[in-house]
């Protein structure tokens, strides 16, 4: 599978050009070998190494290290292996063996990646070969520790569409029918003074003043007060999001917060209560009181109903993914596969997230009540639940553009801590803030797409591309923890958006079986019998596991679509040429030319 991923990150128009090399005097040179490169990508060094392939044994090759990637090409005639690894994917680099190591290929480097693979290279002991490669890799894989920019800030790629324009919050809320006589758009956070990790634009109840919002924010963790994410187009029930209330051990109350939740409930006269979904296990919510947090009590919030969804915290999810990696890479133990997969608890966590989102979606769709969703700080499990519920409820988010907007809105603008959870350019691989929360969300989306194969405009390749560039640092889309930090860094001016890449070649990411349905609500089956491990993502690096290929019907359908597009294009060219001939014909023939029928296509 290594070779299959060789050109994954290549800029299509440049993938056969030679890479630039920076010599010691700073002059760019050309390297004779053809290595894929991106505009702004420079070669730092190259070395002959032995790649210790976990599947095929030692392979002699040449490794090229640029300011964006590690690229290995086999030098052996019987092996066409190529490795193409963005440096942003690297989590840890360790030296293997010492000066006294005598075993074959026992001296070199071990590289741990964030995308569930490890790389091992053996090097010669003489000439500081390992030291040089180690220092260069550490410097460019973890640029933040060396006062270097992430590659996104030197990437000079150009696309024919600007992905930064995909999401406009005013336009998105207008699509939802907002503002209206119950809800208003507030710019109280335009300078990020109310809440540093919230977007500049917030939708809040019409009856609540900005002064009220300031008082309410003081009673919510990180000032992340309840704000609107989505409104049902017919019954007008809403999905709100926030962080936990600052109740503490003494059971503190805040009349402004209590009144605010009543105002939210009263925006819809069809219901007498507000449903609060706390994503945490109840024992965790109680424990958070010791650190000043907590949950909404029945006494304080009498017109609300509280339900705990039992989704575990970031540390549990991190350990679960580590266990997944242990069973899928490099070797898979067939005889104990099911018990090994069960021991990771990964699919159980996926089930709980999906189950929670289904409850949120059903509560709103059925018109039972509006809902308020929170966890502890409201930027991890909360984002999973609101975005998945919105995906189930609103078919627009199941289009390519709609999904991009959903990610920009519920994850990026509302402050999911991408920099902390992924560790972009950071060498601290053991950081307790690292966690695969966004990966879990994408996994849930994939599970839904398997159960509803015609409901999503995008295909599996789209989801994998999003995850690959979650780590790559090629684009600015997932950099930093919140919008305030992105604005300080002028991210939209200095980097390229991932959506530019995707939207400039949408056909590559389209699901051929997609059927547009405006008002269809999706309720996936969240049982262990219907959930499965995403083989094409988690086990894609193992060549011994056959990847799930598109079925022949899908392949033939794609071929027919391409054939149709080709015929339509040729027909349009013929019609254009015919129109030009008719325009140039003498006036005397104009009457007879009107007898020529206009050809139409029935594709």
Curated annotation (Swiss-Prot):
Subcellular location field: Cytoplasm; Cell membrane; Cell projection, Filopodium; Cell projection, Ruffle
Molecular functions (GO terms): intermediate filament binding; phosphatidylinositol binding; phosphatidylinositol-3,5-bisphosphate 3-phosphatase activity; phosphatidylinositol-3-phosphate phosphatase activity; phosphoprotein phosphatase activity
Record keywords, A-Z: Cell membrane, Cell projection, Cytoplasm, Endosome, Hydrolase, Lipid metabolism, Membrane, Phosphoprotein, Protein phosphatase, Protein transport, Transport
Tree of life domain: Eukaryota
Activity regulation annotation text: Allosterically activated by phosphatidylinositol 5-phosphate (PI5P).
Cell membrane listed as a keyword: yes
The GRAM domain, residue ranges: 29-97
Its EC number(s): 3.1.3.95
Residues at the active site: 375
InterPro entries: GRAM (IPR004182), Myotubularin (IPR030564), Myotubularin-like_Pase_dom (IPR010569), PH-like_dom_sf (IPR011993), Prot-tyrosine_phosphatase-like (IPR029021), Tyr_Pase_AS (IPR016130), Tyr_Pase_cat (IPR003595), Tyr_Pase_dom (IPR000387)
Family matches, as SMART domains: GRAM (SM00568), PTPc_motif (SM00404)
Modified residues (Phosphothreonine): 495
Modification Phosphoserine occurs at: 13, 18, 588
Catalysed reaction equations from the record: a 1,2-diacyl-sn-glycero-3-phospho-(1D-myo-inositol-3-phosphate) + H2O = a 1,2-diacyl-sn-glycero-3-phospho-(1D-myo-inositol) + phosphate; a 1,2-diacyl-sn-glycero-3-phospho-(1D-myo-inositol-3,5-bisphosphate) + H2O = a 1,2-diacyl-sn-glycero-3-phospho-(1D-myo-inositol-5-phosphate) + phosphate; 1,2-dioctanoyl-sn-glycero-3-phospho-(1-D-myo-inositol-3-phosphate) + H2O = 1,2-dioctanoyl-sn-glycero-3-phospho-(1D-myo-inositol) + phosphate; 1,2-dioctanoyl-sn-glycero-3-phospho-(1D-myo-inositol-3,5-bisphosphate) + H2O = 1,2-dioctanoyl-sn-glycero-3-phospho-(1D-myo-inositol-5-phosphate) + phosphate
Membrane topology term: Peripheral membrane protein
Top-rank EC class of the record's enzyme: hydrolase
Observed phenotype of the null mutant: Mice are viable although lifespan is severely reduced. An under-representation of mutant males suggests some prenatal lethality. Generalized and progressive myopathy starts at around 4 weeks of age with amyotrophy and accumulation of central nuclei in skeletal muscle fibers, leading to death at 6-14 weeks. Mutants also show mitochondrial disorganization and increased levels of desmin with abnormal desmin intermediate filament formation and architecture.
Gene Ontology cellular component annotations, sorted alphabetically: cytoplasm; cytosol; filopodium; I band; late endosome; plasma membrane; ruffle
Residue positions binding a 1,2-diacyl-sn-glycero-3-phospho-(1D-myo-inositol-3,5-bisphosphate): 288, 313-314, 376-381, 417, 421
A biological process from GO: TOR signaling
PANTHER family in alphabetical order: MYOTUBULARIN, MYOTUBULARIN-RELATED
Assembly and binders: Heterodimer with MTMR12. Interacts with KMT2A/MLL1 (via SET domain). Interacts with DES in skeletal muscle but not in cardiac muscle. Interacts with SPEG.
Homology family: Belongs to the protein-tyrosine phosphatase family. Non-receptor class myotubularin subfamily.
Name of this chain's protein: Myotubularin
Organism: Mus musculus
Gene name in the database record: Mtm1
